[in-house]
Structures are given as C-alpha cells and as structure tokens.
Swiss-Prot record:
Function: Produces ATP from ADP in the presence of a proton gradient across the membrane. The alpha chain is a regulatory subunit.
Protein residues bound to ATP: G169, D170, R171, K172, T173, G174, K175, T176
Any single Gene Ontology cellular-component annotation: plasma membrane
Keywords linked to the UniProt accession: ATP synthesis, ATP-binding, Cell membrane, CF(1), Hydrogen ion transport, Ion transport, Membrane, Nucleotide-binding, Translocase, Transport
Gene3D superfamilies: 2.40.30.20, ATP synthase alpha/beta chain, C-terminal domain (1.20.150.20), P-loop containing nucleotide triphosphate hydrolases (3.40.50.300)
Similarity section: Belongs to the ATPase alpha/beta chains family.
EC numbers: 7.1.2.2
Membrane topology: Peripheral membrane protein
Localization (cell): Cell membrane
Residues marked Required for activity (site): S362
CDD domains in alphabetical order: ATP-synt_F1_alpha_C, ATP-synt_F1_alpha_N, F1-ATPase_alpha_CD
Reactions mediated catalytically: ATP + H2O + 4 H(+)(in) = ADP + phosphate + 5 H(+)(out)
Protein name: ATP synthase subunit alpha
Length: 505
C-alpha cells in the first residue's frame, strides 16, 4: 500500500505540534569534600542560604555557608554513600516538613518521617522549617494559665499559654519527668503537645512514649526524635521542625505546648557543624551566632492576637547545667531569651525533695498574670516564705536557742516543703491544689506531723470530693475561691476525723 504525501506531511505536522521547546535548566555542582554530616561543593554560584540541594544518590542537603568559590552544605540524612566528585544540584526550594492533625499520636524523625512502624502519615500539608516569628502587633499579652499539674510550678512559678519558661538543672535532676507530668496534665485541656527529644537515648524516648501511650496522652501528642547516633544536622534541625508543626495548629487558633529536651545538645550539634564548616569559634568554641540559634527558635512561641485567631504556642526549653553553673554561656543566653526559669537543684533532689524546684532562683516573669484568682490568693507569699525558710534553715543549724516565731516559721516551712513534694506521673488538678494550699497557708497543717502531710493531703482531697464536691466545682467554674466559711468548715470537719500517727517530728 503506497503512503500518500499528504499523510506524511500531516504526521510530520502532528509531531511538530507535540514538540516541547521548553528547556529544564539545572544548576549542578561537584562535591569536593564530605564527612561528619557536612559536604562542600563548587559550581553552585547562585545557591541561596538555607536552600535545599539534592545529591546524586537522592539525599538532600541544606546550603549553609555561601563562599566565593564553594558552598558548605549540611547533609539531611546518611552521608556514607556520598563521594567526592559526585554531582549536587539546586532545587530552588527551602526545607519544609509535613504538618497537620495526621501527625498527632505519631513518632517522627527530624525530617517529619514516621519512625514508629505505624505506616506512612497521610498529610499533604507542609510548612517551612525556618519562618519569621510573629511581630509585636501580632501578639497578645499572656493571660490564660497553662496548668502543669505540678503544685510547685503552678503555685510558685506559674506558666501562661504563649510563655517561654526555661527548665534548667544538672543531669538526672528530674527535668524530663517534669515535662512528662506536664504533658499528662494536658488531657481534656484542649491542648496539643509536641515533645522534641534532642540527643536523648533511644531507649529513654521509647520508655517515655510508652508512658504517654499508657496514660492516653499520645492522643494529643506528637513526638519528634533526633537520637544521639544520628548526624549532627538532625539534632540541629529537630527543634525547628517541632516549632513548624506547632505553628500549623497555633495559626489555626489552637493551643500548643512544645517541649525541647534539651537545647544544650542542639547547641553542641550546631557547634560541631560550625567548626566543620570552618566558621570562626567564639566563647567555649561556640560560633558567634549561637544566641540567634536559640532566640529565633524561642521567639516563635507566642500568644497570637484575636485577629489571628488567638492561638498560642507555649515553649518549655530544657538546658542541662554542669555542677549547677547557670553562668555558663548557653544557660545565660537562654535565660535572657525566656520569660523565666524553673531551676532544679541537685542537692534537694538527692535529699528526697522531688520535684527539686529551687524557689529562690526560679522565677516566672509573665505567668503571674495568667494564674487563676483562687491560686493567686492561696499562693501569694508562698515563694518568698519558702525562700526565707531555706535561709532560716541553714542559719538554724548553728544554734538551738530560737524564739517561738522563728520556730513556727521553720515548722511551717518544713510542712510547705513536704506538701510541694509530688510522686511521678501523678499531676494534680488545679482545684485540688487550691484546697491543699489553702489548708497549708491557713495553718491547718501546723499541728499535723510532717510524716503525715502527704496522707493528710490525699485524704483531704478524697473527703472534699465525697462530701463537699461543690467546693471543687466552684473553683473550676468561677476560677475564684469559694466562700471561706464553707472551705474552713469542710477542712475542719475532715481534720476532726483525721488520725495522725503518734511519731514525733
């Protein structure tokens, strides 16, 4: 069969119409060095700071150092199969992570990828890891309380929604336990929690996730884990990834609590990266912008204005001190960035005072405005009383001839210390705290043996719950103290039937 010339020309025209003249231009460079989570490459003259680049094996990196002849890149993942001479190309994008409701209840790595074996996370929403913090006019002053369920914090150093409260102390003084108890207490509080574990042992994180799961707290919690065996870029990025996930909820009018456990390890990872990138070292070999590393992260926690939906993100950054030295470089930096700090004292911890909160050095700069009226009334002078008790106690060791007023102060102080002790994973609702602290500050515990204080507290709560539950209800609904006569009557009625042990103090 002969092919007609018209058919041939029609086919050629058809093919020409389909011909795509668009060119894909990619800027490709060459890797000149790779090691310890960092690569250097030439040929990426137009790369942007923080831009994602892609290596030949599909691994991504982030451009950090933009020099005249080469670019310093931090590698986001394993770097064992990246070789000198490999190609690396620009993507024109900045790093983004998956965000949204689908992440709740999951454990993810510093790239937002699931690591809990529960399958992929089906979300099509992403947010940039690095964003500008809300400005002054986009914020509102902190006014709503964030109840931690820990008496010593809610009474002495209250935290408000949108605040940044530093938890600082030596290793093994109960920092993470404070965070876990606070997370457990957010049940039914309309709060989403993001727990960012930076450089924590994987076995420890696993145990914490199991605790949260057993207590039903994973229903509102996202865990971001960057383990100690992961490359330094992952430890550096994990807090920003957690903040991006939190911002998605905050900008949608929800309330978020984010725990960074702990930022000392992030600073160490950043120091490692900076030294390998050959940035000039400063004090304690940290780079000059280590303050900015933490300030740009913590400024992202905010209470948004009503125009932006009134959402909030409360940050609890952790810093580990060496032998209680809060005047080291990173601790002083973070203290100056945050709105107060809870200082955990190793001596108190080993003396059995747990949580080991040092009332003298702990402070909350904005949380007082967020405290409910009932708590303000019962805990007004508690922090000062406790600090003066510590001073008196050390003074009283030198002599026994103390006047009756001093002895009464010491006796009240011992009972205050005892009442503020709390077992692990047992956060206390604020209405229970108010009644217990009311009993303390109004002298109802002055004649109760110190050894009986914890039992007195538990039995008092049970008694009020059974016989005068309207008192608890009134505190919850009005946020104020109920009628003092009713409160006094309930405590006196309970006390009349309380059987104290006979052991002397």
């Amino acid at each position: 069969m002969a092919i007609q010339a018209e058919e041939i020309s029609a086919l050629i025209k058809q093919q020409l119409e389909k011909f795509d003249t668009t060119l894909t231009v990619e800027e490709v460079g060459t890797v000149t060095y790779v090691g310890d989570g960092v690569a250097r490459a030439t040929g990426l003259a137009n790369a942007l700071a923080g831009e994602l680049v892609e290596f030949a094996n599909g691994t991504y990196g982030m451009a950090q150092n933009l020099e005249s002849s080469e670019v310093g890149i931090i590698i986001l993942g394993g770097f064992d199969d990246i070789r000198e001479g490999d190609t690396v190309k620009r993507t024109g994008r900045i790093m983004e992570v998956p965000v949204g409701e689908q992440l709740i209840g999951r454990v993810v790595n510093a790239l937002g990828q699931p690591i809990d074996g529960l399958g992929e996370i089906k979300t099509d929403k992403t947010r940039p890891v690095e964003v500008k913090a809300p400005g002054v006019m986009e914020r509102k002053s902190v006014s709503e309380p964030l109840q931690t369920g820990i008496k010593a914090i809610d009474a002495l150093v209250p935290i408000g929604r949108g605040q940044r409260e530093l938890i600082i102390g030596d290793r093994k003084t109960g920092k993470t336990s404070l965070a876990i108890d606070t997370i457990l207490n957010q049940k039914d509080q309309n709060m989403i929690v993001i727990y960012v574990a930076i450089g924590q042992k994987n076995s420890t994180v696993r145990a914490q996730v199991e605790t949260l799961r057993q207590m039903g707290a994973m229903d509102y919690t996202i865990v971001v884990n960057a383990g100690p065996s992961e490359p330094a870029p992952m430890l550096y990025l994990a807090p920003y990834v957690g903040a991006a996930m939190g911002e998605e909820f905050m900008y949608n009018g929800k309330h978020v609590l984010i725990v960074y456990d702990d930022l000392s390890k992030q600073a160490t990872a950043y120091r490692e990266l900076s030294l390998i990138l050959r940035r000039p070292p400063g004090r304690e070999a940290y780079p000059g912008d280590v303050f900015y590393l933490h300030s740009r992260l913590l400024e992202r926690a905010a209470k948004l204005s009503d125009e932006l939906g009134g959402g909030s993100m409360t940050a609890l950054p952790f810093i580990e001190t060496q032998a209680g030295d809060v005047s080291a470089y990173i601790p002083t930096n973070v203290i100056s960035i945050t709105d107060g700090q809870v200082f955990l004292d190793a001596d108190q911890f080993y003396a059995g005072v747990r949580p080991a909160i040092d009332a003298g050095t702990s402070v909350s700069r904005v949380g007082g405005d967020a405290q409910i009226k009932a708590m303000k009334k019962v805990a007004g002078t508690l922090r000062l009383d406790l600090a003066s008790f510590r001073e008196l106690e050390s003074f009283a060791q030198f002599g026994s001839d103390l006047d009756s007023a001093t002895q009464a102060k010491l006796a009240r102080g011992r009972r205050t210390v005892e009442i503020l002790k709390q077992p692990l994973n047992k956060p206390m609702p604020v209405q229970h705290q108010v009644v217990v602290l009311y009993a303390l500050t109004h002298g109802y515990l002055d004649d109760v043996e110190v050894a009986d204080i914890q039992r007195f507290q538990d039995e008092l709560i049970a008694y009020v719950d059974a016989n005068a539950s309207e008192l608890f209800k009134a505190i919850v609904e009005t946020k104020n103290l109920p009628e003092e006569a009713d409160l006094n009557a309930a405590i006196e009625a309970f006390k009349a039937g309380f059987a104290g042990s006979e052991s002397a103090e």
